[in-house]
Structures are given as structure tokens and as C-alpha cells.
């Protein structure tokens, strides 16, 4: 998963196909587990654009999307965020969310 800027996320979000943006903070233990789960999903869905960003560096995004906590996975297409995932639960759950 590559680190994305806010601009890179907005560009990916404009596309017709699904894109995901993973928001984390480095001191978050749950984020470390979520990162590992998303890495597996990324291998299973190589065509899906998935980026990540340290929310500490793009705080304006937290306000813009009303992020309540980290980890948070923003999922969207065609300029719209269609889902915000906070409870990652399992690799299978993330796969089911992102395979569409």
C-alpha cells in the first residue's frame, strides 16, 4: 500500500471503479492489525487502488469526511465516498466490502 496525499485520494475517488483510502495513526495498535489485514486484501484484489495516509498529516480530511476514529477505511467511486469502515473485523469482511 502506497502513501497517498489528499490530492491522490481525490483523483482515485473520481474514477468509475472502486477505490479505498486507509487512514491511520502510527501510535494506534488497532491500526497496526488493520494494516496487516489490508495488506492481505490488497494481494487478493491487485486491481483495486488502495492508498493510505497518516491522519496526523492531513487533519483537514478528518473534518471533511467527519472521521470519528482510526483506523478508518474510506471506500468510494465517481467522486463519492460510499462507505466508512471503522470495524475491520476480518480479512474476509474487508474482502467482501472491497470486491465490488
Model-derived segments and spans:
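Thiol-based oxidoreductase modules, predominantly thioredoxin-like and allied folds used
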Residues: 3-4, 23, 42, 46-60
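Short hydrophobic/charged patches on amphipathic alpha-helices used for structural packing
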Residues: 10, 59-62
Amino acid at each position: 500500500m502506497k502513501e497517498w496525499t489528499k490530492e491522490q485520494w481525490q483523483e482515485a475517488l473520481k474514477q468509475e471503479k472502486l477505490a479505498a483510502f486507509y487512514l491511520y495513526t502510527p501510535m494506534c495498535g488497532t491500526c497496526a492489525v488493520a494494516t496487516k489485514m489490508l495488506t492481505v486484501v490488497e494481494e487478493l484484489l491487485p486491481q483495486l487502488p488502495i492508498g493510505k495516509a497518516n491522519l496526523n498529516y492531513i487533519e483537514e480530511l478528518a473534518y471533511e469526511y467527519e472521521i470519528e476514529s482510526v483506523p478508518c477505511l474510506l471506500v468510494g467511486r465517481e467522486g463519492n465516498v460510499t462507505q466508512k469502515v471503522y470495524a475491520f473485523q476480518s480479512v474476509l469482511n474487508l474482502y467482501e466490502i472491497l470486491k465490488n
